[in-house]
């Protein structure tokens, strides 16, 4: 980490980067590294489909503000991260809790919600779900994707634990190929949580809308920290 910071804050590097804003999508070196990492997980995300964020929480917020409006129904696994419930509630969303089981979300509950409430989004932690530690089974994953296609809702997959999880673990974004799914992750669980470097990977058709939401909130993200992170993980 110290070596990466020294590299991006050298006089030559600072002269090049300090007098301009960062790239709207995020540092291109970091996005190339992340693209290769996602490809290894089976998630087909080109650098142009990746948007860097101020941590994974910011990525989740961008998705919500882009795809939802106040009053929309959102399915969220329960138990789950209290901040996610609070964040969606603050945005005026109607939260539909889905019990999390050992092999994935309760599919009967999801199907019932789909029939009664027409949810717009499902928020899921497929791998090392917090707090249960469970991982999604292939069978449950395929059924979740079938429900999403049949009832026209998007899925945001929070893969915050990806860097300590097996690459072969079942991920909705890999099975779906980033068609109806959006991938979210960050580095707080393995490296420099106070750098607040996160990212999302989305279907090409959604990238411009998601980027607009990012730009309206933060304009860009901290370029020096993104460059340092790229050197750390490359």
Model-derived features with residue positions:
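Conserved core of the PLP fold type I
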Residues: 16-152, 163-175, 182
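A generic short alpha-helical patch detector that favors 3-5-residue windows
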Residues: 26, 114, 176, 202, ...
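Amphipathic, well-packed alpha-helical segments that form the structural scaffold of globular domains
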Residues: 6, 10, 35-39, 123, ...
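PLP-dependent aminotransferase class I/II
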Residues: 182-183, 189-234
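Glycine-rich phosphate-binding segment of PLP-dependent enzymes
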Residues: 1-20
């Amino acid at each position: 980490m110290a070596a990466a910071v020294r590299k991006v804050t050298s006089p030559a590097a600072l002269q090049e980067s300090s007098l301009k804003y960062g790239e709207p999508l995020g540092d291109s070196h970091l996005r190339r590294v992340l693209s290769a990492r996602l490809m290894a997980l089976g998630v087909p995300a080109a650098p142009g489909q990746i948007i860097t964020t101020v941590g994974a929480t910011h990525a989740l917020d961008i998705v919500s503000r882009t795809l939802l409006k106040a009053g929309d129904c959102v399915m969220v696994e329960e138990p789950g991260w209290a901040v996610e419930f609070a964040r969606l509630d603050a945005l005026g969303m109607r939260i539909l809790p889905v019990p999390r089981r050992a092999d994935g979300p309760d599919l009967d509950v999801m199907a019932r919600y789909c029939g009664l409430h027409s949810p717009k989004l499902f928020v899921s932690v497929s791998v090392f779900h917090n707090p249960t530690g469970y991982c999604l089974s292939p069978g449950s994953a395929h059924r979740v994707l079938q429900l999403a296609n049949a009832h026209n809702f998007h899925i945001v997959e929070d893969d915050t634990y990806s860097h300590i999880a097996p690459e072969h673990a079942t991920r909705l974004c890999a099975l779906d190929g980033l068609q109806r799914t959006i991938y979210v992750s960050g580095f707080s669980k393995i490296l420099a949580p106070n750098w607040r470097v996160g990212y999302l990977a989305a279907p090409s058709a959604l990238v411009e809308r998601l980027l607009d939401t990012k730009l309206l909130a933060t304009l860009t993200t901290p370029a020096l920290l993104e460059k340092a992170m790229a050197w750390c993980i490359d």
